Amino acid sequence: MLGTVIATPTLNERAMYTAFSAARNSACLSRQVGAAITSADGEILATGWNDVPKAFGGLYQTETYGSSPDEDRRCWNLGGGFCSNDQEKRAISNAIVDLLTSEGLIEEAKRDQVYQVIRKKSQLKSLIEFSRAVHAEMHALLSAGGTDGGKIRGGKLFVTTYPCHSCARHIVAAGVREVYFLEPYRKSLATKLHEDAITENENETDKVRVMPFDGVAPSRFLRFFSAHPKGRKNAEGNMHTREAHPVAFVTIEAIPTLESLIVQGLSSRGI
């Protein structure tokens, strides 16, 4: 990417950028996730993001600036803003401690200590099913199913975060063939629960492949694919010829090397 030729995004890069952009619609307190579904030919069928569903279809979203906040019933606008998933996990942790105390298995003086162990160190912390939000992948599947359902089968799903195990089974059932993600998600048990249908091995084509995205990152999309500020053609209509010049400056030095260079520079200045 030296700016000497016109480069446009691949189908996969375009789809992932679309998913990345869709994530910005989310008001979820935990994380913003975006998804995009394409047909086998790369046609974008639908996008989705994680947020709270509203009655009779769709998700809550900002319709227009200045609209009444009372109409927005997302978590950020309820009771000062709270995550229902965290709230329920706290309630479960307290209920377990109450039970252990009432059964005489722990002393009253150790309630707080036991609560912290249960809440922070047990598998309870990984529970995700108490969230009010529809996940981005499900939102995209629902949207695509309503208009282009037949094209989902054999298609691809692009998502900014690795699918959770709940979404994974719906992705498999929908007939999606490949999934590409940007960020890992340690809580997901997708391959553990569905090893018969899901794989992270790109060579296993008899299963739904879940693979890290390879291409221009969405955060760099506009930088790499926007036209040159001075335009692409001259007054005669001929394309400009330009000297090779990096579109983005990224050092290839390792971090320890960079740190040592900085230390040397500071030392030479007596700092």
Question: In which residue ranges do the predicted regions lie?
Answer:
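Zinc-dependent deaminase catalytic domain
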Residues: 1-271
